C-alpha cells in the first residue's frame, strides 16, 4: 500500500513537471505558472521520498512501478491546468485517507501518525489554494480572456513567492 502511494506521489510530480514546462514554452510564456507547477512537482517528489525513507526505516521493501504518462501534453490554459491539478490533489488526498484507514484497521499507529503529521494538513491547504486559483481565474474570465491568465500569472502567482 505504501508502494502504491509512492507511485501516486511520483505520478503527481511528473504531471506537475509536464505542466511547468508547458507554461515555460515560448508560445505560452507564463513564467509564474511554470514556477508554481515546478515547485509543486518538487513537493510531490519529496512526499514520495519521505515515504520511501519510512518504508526502509520500518524494514519494508520498496517496489517501484512504471510511472504513468500525464493525461495531456498540451495543458491548453492556466485554468485547465489548475482544474487538473485540483483533481489530482483530491485523488492524492483520497489515496492518503485510504492508506490511513488501512493503517487504522491494521492497528499501525506509527503510520497513522506519519500520514497525519506529514501529509493530511498539507493536502487540505493545497486543495484550498488550487480551488481559490480556479475560482479567481474563472471570475477574471479565463480561459476566454488571455489577459486574465496573464494578469493572474503576474499579480497572483508572481507575488506568491513573497508570501511563502
Swiss-Prot record:
Report the principal subcellular site.
cytoplasm
Query: Where are the annotated coiled coils located?
Result: none
Q: Does the keyword Cytoplasm apply?
A: yes
Where is each Ferritin-like diiron domain found? 1-141
Give me any GO biological process, just one. Answer: negative regulation of ferroptosis
- What PROSITE patterns does the database record attribute to this sequence? FERRITIN_1, FERRITIN_2, FERRITIN_LIKE
Q: Per its database record, what is this protein's job?
A: Stores iron in a soluble, non-toxic, readily available form. Important for iron homeostasis. Has ferroxidase activity. Iron is taken up in the ferrous form and deposited as ferric hydroxides after oxidation. Also plays a role in delivery of iron to cells. Mediates iron uptake in capsule cells of the developing kidney. Delivery to lysosomes is mediated by the cargo receptor NCOA4 for autophagic degradation and release of iron.
Q: What is this protein called?
A: Ferritin heavy chain
Can you name the source organism? Oryctolagus cuniculus
From which lineage does this chain's organism come? Answer: Eukaryota, Metazoa, Chordata, Craniata, Vertebrata
Instruction: Report which gene this protein is encoded by.
Output: FTH1
Amino acid at each position: 500500500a505504501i508502494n502504491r502511494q509512492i507511485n501516486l506521489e511520483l505520478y503527481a510530480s511528473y504531471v506537475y513537471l509536464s505542466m511547468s514546462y508547458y507554461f515555460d514554452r515560448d508560445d505560452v510564456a507564463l513564467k509564474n505558472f511554470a514556477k508554481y507547477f515546478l515547485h509543486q512537482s518538487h513537493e510531490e517528489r519529496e512526499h514520495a521520498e519521505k515515504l520511501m525513507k519510512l518504508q526502509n526505516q520500518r524494514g519494508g521493501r520498496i517496489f517501484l512501478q512504471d510511472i504513468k504518462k500525464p493525461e495531456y501534453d498540451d495543458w491548453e490554459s492556466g485554468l485547465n491546468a489548475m482544474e487538473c491539478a485540483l483533481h489530482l490533489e483530491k485523488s492524492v488526498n483520497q489515496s492518503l485517507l485510504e492508506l490511513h484507514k488501512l493503517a487504522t484497521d491494521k492497528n499501525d499507529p506509527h503510520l497513522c501518525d506519519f500520514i497525519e503529521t506529514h501529509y493530511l494538513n498539507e493536502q487540505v491547504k493545497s486543495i484550498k489554494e488550487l480551488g481559490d486559483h480556479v475560482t479567481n481565474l474563472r471570475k477574471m474570465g479565463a480561459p476566454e480572456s488571455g489577459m486574465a491568465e496573464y494578469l493572474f500569472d503576474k499579480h497572483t502567482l508572481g507575488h506568491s513567492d513573497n508570501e511563502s
